[in-house]
Amino acid sequence: MNKLYFRALRLSIYGFLAMAALLFVPAGTLDYWQAYVFMAVFVGGSAAITVYLAIKDPKLLERRMNVGPTAEKEPTQKIIMVFALLGFIALLVVPALDRRFMWSSVPAWVSVLGDILVTLGFLLVYFVIRENSYAASTIQVAEGQTVISTGPYAVVRHPMYAGVLPLLIGTPLALGSWWGLGALIFFMPALIWRLLDEERFLHKNLPGYTKYTRKVRYRLVPFVW
């Protein structure tokens, strides 16, 4: 168990350092208050979820730490995760470059709104992992896994991705960049592609999933899609 905690701590530190590098190096300055606030919100949200899982659901924490292109088994998902990773990097780097070259001017209240959206995203993700102990970071069906149709899963089929949406939209705003929203062009197709491919996999491999999709019509956004 201690190995799991140390691994979680190590990954958190690596993630923090990588995020700091992706923000402050392209920005060319440490005088970037939006980045400090965003990192506090993002790291705080990530840490809160990690601590919750470490206490309440260590097995899910282990599943969720197995993440990234190399963790996926399906070749299609490996490709999708590469695009998703590049998209998230762009969500950080483009606003940082915007800060450096002053491409856009975002009011402070918009940046605060962005941080609120990021916080909302983490809150929605918390509700998902609290409801579903099989919410792994990779597409798989674990032994004994059943269809979850309660909580956020009663509203949309993919509440984890729904929770990611405000986080993605809020990130460039929190970092003080209108141009950063353009990076969503790279991320959103990967998200939708992953969602549809995951549904194909679950229809085939998770008993009861097809019946669940007839009950819950919306995939990502209620009354929209």
Please annotate each region the language model reported:
Residues 1-150, 162-225:
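Membrane-anchoring alpha-helices and their flanking helix-loop junctions
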Residues 154-162:
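Histidine-centered phosphotransfer motif of kinases
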